[in-house]
């Protein structure tokens, strides 16, 4: 098989998963570089880069790159493609060529996003792209239009979602019920359903924005009978499910890692875990306006969105305590994936607690658009999603490559990263409570201390990213082969060896169901 046939025209779920992982890693480094520019600007009062426009272009690009080109490609595209067919005993994905197209839509989409930063003044709108700031007066030129066209990544996600839903429902062995599939498979299924239902609404919203900018429509312009609040509703009806799309596959991975390294044959409360994820997926669609408490909604509307948002804490709590129950009484192996998983449980819970604070509409009036919100979502993303990715990466790296990571360096990497992200984001809670607003490139001197500490933390995190690159290089360089994975009876993805052959389950697996 030629290089081009294997990697450009690939129809193999393992190869496409590998492409997603490489692309996501590359994008993650780009996103990290952007975040360091942000923290460099904020390390001391005064300007470093120039005006607020260039700063906001960097902030916007940082968000888009991390969400659409790092977390989603790695979790759903990388781990999802690699593991879902192996875990359900399918020969491949349901639509292998569409799978390839889903991947190859991402690099052009990424180029469109980068192009938006290089023309005119760039798209300094924030990732929410609210009009009128994103309209053709405040942002004349092609920047925002190019940023809108990077919705191509959304097309990729919709195609991927269709593929995963079809694969998971239709390509299991007949004897296997949906309630016998591993939790990671469930998490990807629910994530795919969320993508399929939410992305078209975003498409509608940004298409209206595109026509407002270029074809003189007035969907979001009061002068023509439109309403900018309509855009916020459309955007957040996608935007809130999106944050659950980012974390749900992480929940699935953490369930596998915790059970494996606690020496358990299954996670505690399988059905509770499944229904908790289903509940989170459902509730994620009916809380979107908690992002909009500052736009003057009726008191009864605010009361509803406050209480509905708090209800999400219940299924989330079920998951957290089920992970703790899985750990309980186990023989814990303190391997790097376990460290990441424990870090995830602890820090994700802290992020969840600040989320409960922000759910209160009255408190949110004071905290909205301050660094408290930034601290909240970076605790659940930078220490939830990213820690889950690193837990999954360190756990399944031997499966993907056949090589093992250096154990002590990987643990050291965890220590550096843990220190870095906490030093970066914990002080931001204090900044937010003291009223420092988001999306400004400068600040009063009173905020200097915590900003300086936060920026030092970002440099430590950068060191961790460089360490990770070195650790991966070292693994391929040293070529320590995997001898024998443990617990293969309950972890079907390992049964073909490390790495598995190019084609697995070429004939349907025989499943014996215990009566």
Swiss-Prot record:
Ligand binding (Cu cation): 240, 290-291
Pfam families: COX1
Disulfide bridge positions per record: none
Keyword entries, A-Z: Calcium, Copper, Electron transport, Heme, Iron, Magnesium, Membrane, Metal-binding, Mitochondrion, Mitochondrion inner membrane, Respiratory chain, Sodium, Translocase, Transmembrane, Transmembrane helix, Transport
Residues binding O2: 244
Transmembrane stretches, start-end: 13-41, 52-87, 96-118, 142-170, 183-212, 228-261, 270-286, 299-327, 336-357, 371-400, 407-433, 447-478
Cofactor(s) the protein needs: heme; Cu cation
Listed pathway(s): Energy metabolism; oxidative phosphorylation
Catalytic activity: 4 Fe(II)-[cytochrome c] + O2 + 8 H(+)(in) = 4 Fe(III)-[cytochrome c] + 2 H2O + 4 H(+)(out)
Keyword RNA-binding listed: no
Gene Ontology cellular component list: mitochondrial inner membrane; mitochondrion; respiratory chain complex IV
UniProt keyword annotation of Heme present: yes
Documented EC number(s): 7.1.1.9
GO biological process: aerobic respiration; oxidative phosphorylation; respiratory electron transport chain
Binding-site list for heme a3: 376
Gene Ontology molecular function: cytochrome-c oxidase activity; heme binding; metal ion binding
Predominant cellular place of this UniProt entry's protein: mitochondrion
Location of this chain's protein in the cell: Mitochondrion inner membrane
Annotated positions binding Mg(2+): 368-369
Binding residues for Fe(II)-heme a: 62, 378
Assembly information from the UniProt record: Component of the cytochrome c oxidase (complex IV, CIV), a multisubunit enzyme composed of 14 subunits. The complex is composed of a catalytic core of 3 subunits MT-CO1, MT-CO2 and MT-CO3, encoded in the mitochondrial DNA, and 11 supernumerary subunits COX4I, COX5A, COX5B, COX6A, COX6B, COX6C, COX7A, COX7B, COX7C, COX8 and NDUFA4, which are encoded in the nuclear genome.
Protein name: Cytochrome c oxidase subunit 1
Taxon lineage: Eukaryota, Metazoa, Chordata, Craniata, Vertebrata
Gene: MT-CO1
